[in-house]
């Protein structure tokens, strides 16, 4: 039987892995430079955690979660997003005892049963962070500023930040009523999902891809904000303008998770077609209470690694690729192998990537393999070289080679390689 990867998943290797390393390492550097700590949570949680946080009527809960019963009969779900697990960890481990203004970032796989397509997989990967404890618009500004910093550090430029405020639970009541009145007049024209959401979660009608043209003329949430939410939103825009972070106000933006309040935003890249959202986030001031904790203001963001990589490729951004087969040690015979291993150890201490042949191949076979793996240099050691106390350093691109005294080989090779 030939085993194949599950539909909606990917194997990542070769040159592709360096895109992942580039995104992940850039994200870590940006987060840690801003005082954000790493947190790691399990990839599966109690199903109820996501039902309560994401929303029972959301598409994620209704259609997309990977849910199963374990041997103890408990309902378990592979995490479809990263915020709820971080909040659960915060509450369970009493991290609030460390005080407010806490920041945590995460990197890892998420799971949703969706139709696989470019940039949308069933196992996908996210980078994200949460800022916990501040209700000030300064926190909202910091999140958006750091997202913008991260994307620019990657080299991306062809994206736009879409921004909206959907208000708090108090002012959103009037907004829902306005949407009910507007959509009630055209209910017969709406798709089946929108007809269902009309009764259960009317804000999600603004997010419908089928009936999006109706959303363009729908009432705007900003026109129904209470004084506090309006001040919060205006102050956020003031900060963004002061620091020249470009954004576009998008009054149809609500996001797909029910826990959002006030600020919501998305980052969309012009080179990705229909699936052009590469990051998004917002504020979720009520989520801690919903999950059994005290009232704690918080907000965060998540970015899809697969889509960010597509954006990097769309902009043809060159990424750093390390040659892990830079030097290939070719040995002929047992004594030569022992000396070759010792040489490799010494070169690795110098920070070089060094591979040693372990297949007992002939000289031609070892050199052929070194070429195939992309090695730049080969170090050749055989009985004759051992007798002379030398090694041969061959440049596999030019074919030039030089004999090097074994006693000085490590320093010579390290210096030679560093010049290229």
UniProtKB/Swiss-Prot annotation:
<dbReference type="InterPro" id="IPR006195">
    <property type="entry name" value="aa-tRNA-synth_II"/>
</dbReference>
<dbReference type="GO" id="GO:0004821">
    <property type="term" value="F:histidine-tRNA ligase activity"/>
</dbReference>
<dbReference type="InterPro" id="IPR036621">
    <property type="entry name" value="Anticodon-bd_dom_sf"/>
</dbReference>
<protein>
    <recommendedName>
        <fullName>Histidine--tRNA ligase</fullName>
        <ecNumber>6.1.1.21</ecNumber>
    </recommendedName>
</protein>
<dbReference type="InterPro" id="IPR045864">
    <property type="entry name" value="aa-tRNA-synth_II/BPL/LPL"/>
</dbReference>
<dbReference type="Pfam" id="PF03129">
    <property type="entry name" value="HGTP_anticodon"/>
</dbReference>
<keyword id="KW-0547">Nucleotide-binding</keyword>
<comment type="similarity">
    <text>Belongs to the class-II aminoacyl-tRNA synthetase family.</text>
</comment>
<keyword id="KW-0963">Cytoplasm</keyword>
<keyword id="KW-0436">Ligase</keyword>
<keyword id="KW-0030">Aminoacyl-tRNA synthetase</keyword>
<keyword id="KW-0648">Protein biosynthesis</keyword>
<dbReference type="InterPro" id="IPR004516">
    <property type="entry name" value="HisRS/HisZ"/>
</dbReference>
<dbReference type="InterPro" id="IPR015807">
    <property type="entry name" value="His-tRNA-ligase"/>
</dbReference>
<dbReference type="GO" id="GO:0005737">
    <property type="term" value="C:cytoplasm"/>
</dbReference>
<dbReference type="GO" id="GO:0005524">
    <property type="term" value="F:ATP binding"/>
</dbReference>
<dbReference type="InterPro" id="IPR041715">
    <property type="entry name" value="HisRS-like_core"/>
</dbReference>
<comment type="subunit">
    <text>Homodimer.</text>
</comment>
<dbReference type="InterPro" id="IPR033656">
    <property type="entry name" value="HisRS_anticodon"/>
</dbReference>
<dbReference type="InterPro" id="IPR004154">
    <property type="entry name" value="Anticodon-bd"/>
</dbReference>
<dbReference type="GO" id="GO:0006427">
    <property type="term" value="P:histidyl-tRNA aminoacylation"/>
</dbReference>
<dbReference type="Pfam" id="PF13393">
    <property type="entry name" value="tRNA-synt_His"/>
</dbReference>
<keyword id="KW-0067">ATP-binding</keyword>
